[in-house]
């Protein structure tokens, strides 16, 4: 480049906010860029293949990868969709693979900035690994003599953590249990109206990204879109996600991206009125429509929780219906908020083996037991079916997650972090705070539950939520001919009964890898094993009314700002 260019550079660094609609960070970047006649808005997404993506990027404790190929593919799709949406606005998206600190530094240097500083705007991150990346960016740019300001903008929750009115010191003062938090927030706080897409009108976009890059002679290839191989995934990983399992509970033809996220919300709430029955069907396990399936798009920011909550409120208003179902969807978004705020308050304690309650306990790390759990070969059909579904599709129902967590931590006595890391690798909807705190809750080491141990009655759960074994047979086809009365406990069948249904225990289907006698004892008169002591809550109850907070809640108790 010959000579420095005079302009204001404002980089929007997309992270877990892969959308235009209701994106506070993007709105902030547009405002900064629009404040100067020579302002440039430069959108970029960086695949960090040194810390997140690739077959060889592993978790700290286990051999689980930080991001499995299925979620990586979903994010690739989301980034491609984001680029298309930006291009429709006259903009574009630069996509790079590498360390964010290196790439952001190179961009600033190639553009030869003469303005006072570069604005780098991104959505706020709260956990240590993500914050470390922020620090790496700041350190590297400073070492290169680049003047910059890194803006981290909150935008992934229903409520802004900086304006939690009932709590004097914001997230640092929130209760360590959910119910009092929920009551205060619903009483005193309002959900902000979702923001419009800030660049849905070309006149609001300061510059066309491609034209500016061409004018200043920047050598960035802004049409580049990496493949899984480019991100460091091996052939086996790539082949494993090349097809969609027909048994998948995800909506047919689902893809990553804001376009598909908005389509799913429209389908679930408006086109099919599935929202009407959500409260009653949310604990099912077969099919695409028993639950919203919004979570994968929420996790990578293809849609905002405020948008979903607003659609629920609009549904109540336009259809004249206020029900447990519409409320419960917003309630679960509030739980998601709480986990994020809780993680902000307690920091790295959400990753400690002793949990946020700092309860020391000897955890096993038996690799054979852990692998049997991962492979869905434990001998307990409910556990095996759920684990096989996760491996094949990247999805598992909420009911399934609770049971497999309880089984790993409380029956196998394996370090709960092994499970959390495996979920981090496999889940399409992996969210740091939600994943790790749900695992802490299940292992009984979380302040959220007061350290209470809720041991799930695996067999009873199986009989309650999959009475006829439809889900079990779907994912454990070797049990296809086992009768309904034995499908939940195949190890209790006699040899003659096994011969009759063509199944040999230990050969066609594994024998139980551990004796959870108390579970069997309370579910069958022909059980074996000595009962174990449990609290009054044996797995958070098993009826559809297992959430006592509903008793005291007015329907539609969430509030929106009218601005």
Residue ranges and their predicted role:
Residues 74, 78, 257, 378, ...:
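Soluble or luminal CAZymes and related metallo-dependent hydrolases
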Residues 287-478, 484:
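Active-site-proximal binding-pocket segments
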Residues 65-69, 73, 252-255, 259, ...:
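Charge-dense, low-complexity intrinsically disordered segments
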Residues 27, 67, 89, 122, ...:
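Generic recognition of cysteine residues
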Residues 25, 78, 82, 100, ...:
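Alpha-helical packing segments of well-folded alpha/beta enzyme cores
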Residues 1-206, 388-389, 434, 438, ...:
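Trp/Phe/Arg-rich N-terminal binding region typifying the photolyase-homology
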Residues 146, 170-357, 465-466, 470-563:
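Glycine/tryptophan-enriched, flexible segments
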């Amino acid at each position: 480049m010959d000579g420095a260019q005079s302009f204001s550079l404002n980089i929007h660094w997309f992270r877990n906010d892969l959308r235009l609609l209701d994106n506070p960070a993007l709105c902030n970047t547009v405002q900064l860029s629009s404040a100067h006649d020579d302002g440039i808005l430069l959108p970029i997404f960086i695949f960090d293949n040194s810390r997140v993506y690739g077959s060889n990027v592993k978790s700290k404790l286990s051999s689980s990868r930080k991001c499995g190929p299925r979620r990586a593919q979903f994010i690739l799709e989301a980034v491609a969709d984001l680029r298309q949406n930006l291009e429709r606005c006259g903009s574009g998206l630069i996509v790079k693979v590498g360390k964010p600190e290196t790439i952001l530094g190179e961009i600033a240097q190639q553009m030869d900035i003469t303005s006072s500083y570069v604005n780098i705007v991104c959505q706020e991150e709260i956990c240590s690994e993500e914050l470390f990346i922020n620090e790496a960016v700041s350190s590297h740019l400073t070492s290169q003599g680049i003047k910059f300001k890194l803006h981290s903008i909150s935008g992934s929750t229903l409520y802004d953590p900086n304006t939690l009115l009932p709590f004097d010191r914001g997230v640092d003062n929130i209760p360590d249990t959910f119910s009092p938090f929920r009551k205060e927030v619903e009483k005193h706080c309002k959900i902000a109206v979702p923001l419009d897409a800030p660049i849905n009108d070309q006149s609001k976009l300061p510059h066309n990204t491609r034209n500016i890059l061409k004018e200043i002679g920047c050598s960035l290839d802004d049409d580049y879109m990496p493949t899984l191989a480019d991100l460091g995934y091996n052939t086996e990983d790539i082949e494993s996600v090349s097809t969609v399992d027909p048994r998948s509970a995800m909506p047919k033809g689902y893809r990553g991206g804001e376009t598909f996220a908005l389509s799913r919300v429209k389908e679930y709430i408006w086109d099919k009125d599935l929202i009407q029955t959500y409260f009653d069907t949310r604990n099912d396990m077969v099919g695409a429509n028993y639950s919203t399936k919004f979570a994968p798009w929420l996790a990578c920011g293809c849609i905002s929780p405020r948008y979903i909550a607003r659609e629920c409120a609009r549904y109540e208003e336009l259809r004249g219906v206020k029900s447990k179902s519409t409320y419960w969807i917003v309630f679960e978004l509030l739980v998601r908020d709480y986990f994020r705020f809780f993680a902000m308050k307690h920091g790295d304690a959400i990753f400690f083996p002793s949990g946020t309650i700092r309860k020391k306990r000897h955890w096993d790390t038996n690799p054979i037991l852990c692998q049997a759990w991962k492979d869905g070969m434990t001998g307990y059909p409910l556990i095996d079916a759920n684990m096989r579904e996760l491996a094949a599709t990247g999805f598992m129902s909420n009911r399934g997650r609770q049971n497999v967590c309880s089984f790993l931590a409380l029956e196998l006595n394996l370090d709960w972090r092994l499970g959390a890391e495996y979920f981090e690798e496999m889940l399409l909807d992996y969210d740091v705070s939600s994943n790790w705190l749900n695992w802490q809750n299940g292992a009984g080491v979380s302040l959220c539950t007061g350290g209470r141990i809720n041991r799930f009655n695996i067999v009873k759960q199986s009989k309650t939520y999959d009475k006829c074994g439809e889900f079990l047979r779907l994912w454990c086809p070797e049990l296809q001919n086992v009768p309904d009365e034995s499908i939940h406990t195949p190890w209790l069948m006699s040899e003659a009964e096994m011969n009759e249904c063509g199944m040999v225990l230990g050969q066609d289907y594994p024998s139980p890898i551990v004796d959870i006698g108390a579970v069997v004892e309370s579910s069958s008169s022909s059980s074996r094993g000595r009962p174990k002591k449990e609290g009054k809550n044996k797995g958070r109850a098993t009826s559809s009314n297992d959430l006592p907070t509903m008793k005291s809640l007015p329907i539609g108790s969430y509030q929106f700002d009218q601005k």
